[in-house]
Amino acid sequence: MVEGVNYYWISIEMKPEASLLTTFTVQMPMAEVNNMPATIVWDGKSDVRRMGIGVRHAGDDGAAAFRIPGLVTTNNGTLLGVYDIRYNSSVDLQEMVDIGVSRSTDKGQTWEPMRVAMTFGETGGLPHSQNGVGDPSILVDEKTNTIWIVAAWTHGMGNGRAWWNSMPGMSADSTAQLMLVKSEDDGKTWSQPINITSQVKDPSWYFLLQGPGRGITMKDGTLVFPIQFIDSTRIPNAGIMYSKDRGTTWHLHNLARTNTTEAQVAEVEPGVLMLNMRDNRGGSRAVATTRDLGKTWYEHPSSRSALQEPVCMASLIHVDAKDNITGKDLLIFSNPNTTKGRNHITIKVSTDGGMTWPLSNQVTLDEDEGWGYSCLSMIDKETVGIFYESSVAHMTFQAIRLTDLVK
């Protein structure tokens, strides 16, 4: 201690056996110095706090950083978290990057050792750092329990940023490649990469890649991933790609809104898809809907007004009334709830199709700065899970009761 004002922080570490659903509050009612009462100015809040698991930290498995979370729950109830393994630094492609998977069979309480789902090593005689693959999105085919991961593979590019160095064309020597892997054993092992670039990319586009996070299975069995592409004028645009034959062939139609990038997709009614998009204009999320798998798009009334953002990736899932404890159709959304910085990671729930997101239906998880990306998945009918880039771990997992979110 020093003379004058002294600052202290309270830090709580959970026991390994503590339930992820544990909540607590912290206060400091008194303090003593040399057995004498000391004056306290309490700058903290007595908000409810929640337990969490740091699934990936800097330095784990020899990697400098882990970024870009995706999360799904398989038909068997297994949680699969995906992310970039950024071996050398936290920077984006092009770099030495593979796709990692963390797997939990006990609702996120514990996680198995990391698996590598996609790597290109020294393909084409170039070093690993010239064969990065990243920004994963993961999808469960709910009809078959086949799990798909889509990611962008970049070959060459001299360690320049792929966003600016991927060029028009179709070959790996000129442009980023859109790659799939699949698992048919609940995420334990993964296939060799499948290149679908020729199925969905326009040769005039500079860059085609997925919207990181997750995709969905529609009620009619159609598989859908969000995508983004930099067109021939170098403007980025968000949209979707889909498969009607269990992932064998993929199709892509039109952009949902220009000058948008990372997006997430949800089926809000049978056959109706909502795309929630990161918008380079800043300030708030763009939202559009389609009834024909992206041939035509309609701006949603909530677009550019209902959900603030600092220009960052976000997550959106739809949960049918029959599939959750509230008995209501839910849209669940997460992002940094701010227009500046990437802080205040918040989960919000809408019960009116995304028109409104009441304050009473919001829970803030992390007020401090981080990279800010997140992905949601229902754990069971009562609980939603979030896998996100927090201020304390590169990949953090938390579980929140729906009854804490829906008032």
Can you name each region flagged by the protein language model?
Residues 27-30, 43-45:
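Preference for long, well-ordered alpha-helical segments
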Residues 4, 8, 13, 41-407:
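Asp-box/BNR beta-propeller blade signature and adjacent active/binding-site loops
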Residues 33-37:
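Short, solvent-exposed loop/turn segments at the edges of extracellular beta-sandwich modules
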